[in-house]
Amino acid sequence: MRGSASRTDAGGAAARRAAGRRPVTILLLAVMAAVIATAAAAWSGRATAAPGGGKIVAVGAESQYANVIGQVGGKYVQASAIMSNPNTDPHTFEASIAVAREVGSAQLVVQNGIGYDAFMNTIESAAPSSGRTVINVQRLLKLSDATPNPHLWYDPGTMPRVADSIAAALSVIQPSHKAYFEANAAAFNDSLGKLTAAIASFKAAYSGVPVATTEPVADYLLTSLGADNLTPWTFQADIMNGVDPSPQNVAVQRALLSEHKVKVLLYNQQVTDTLTESFITLAEQNHIPVVGVYETMPEPGYDYQTWMQAEVRDLRAAVADKIATEHL
């Protein structure tokens, strides 16, 4: 298996998209509520501390958001990620007591929304805290709950707005450092210039290039690059949600590869199953380069900017030189 996790419960995972994650048991939820309440009480003083106090405790539900928190907050923030292991399937992540404690202690939380990290809502609602600010990226972008693709960080327009929102939230918690946070957010946004240039260069050279995917992990990025994703959306969504795709869609996907209708196959490097492995093998047999893309930021050695730049670089290498890159 190329992915470090495997999705083999195709039929049983059909409800995962709606629920966001596996349901938390009543007992665990009760314990979480107690843990969060204790943590919230312990940290309430810190959350309302005088400007210029100790480090702000912040949590990103996904490592990419935690990384941006750290870049914007700098020396005044202690940022951590709930989902930071690229060997974990984000779609089957289950919150633990330790996670509940971590979220309960946070003064700032950044989460994705659209059901991708619904366990965060469960934890936060178990014990609300007036000292906790939550940035829900879905709400920030004014996206509906019916938005089909939750991988918002792959849209180049997402993180600049997230960085600015983080700076604003941190400035409320520690107003004396507002200029520092705003300068860091501006520096982060400026640093995305290399990614913007790489996207523009790819689009100028390869706009309309046909590609296939197993899941919609990088679909927002593919759109910005001008690539033409020929894989049926319903196929991508079924694989993402752990549902068996229709025989018709499977046949379409096979034809894209066996008939050389696409220049590259992108797959979710973190999660594969027997079906997706068969498509990877078919692509390789037909000398179509395969590129692995990630749902959570690879660590160590990457920040959000260099991660996205690497994804664009690898896709360009596949299209231009038929170079496969399955691991960053």
Give the ranges of each region predicted by the language model:
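Extreme N-terminal signal-anchor transmembrane helix of membrane signaling/transducer proteins, especially
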Residues: 33-37
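Extracytoplasmic metal-acquisition and chelation regions
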Residues: 2-3, 7-28, 38-328
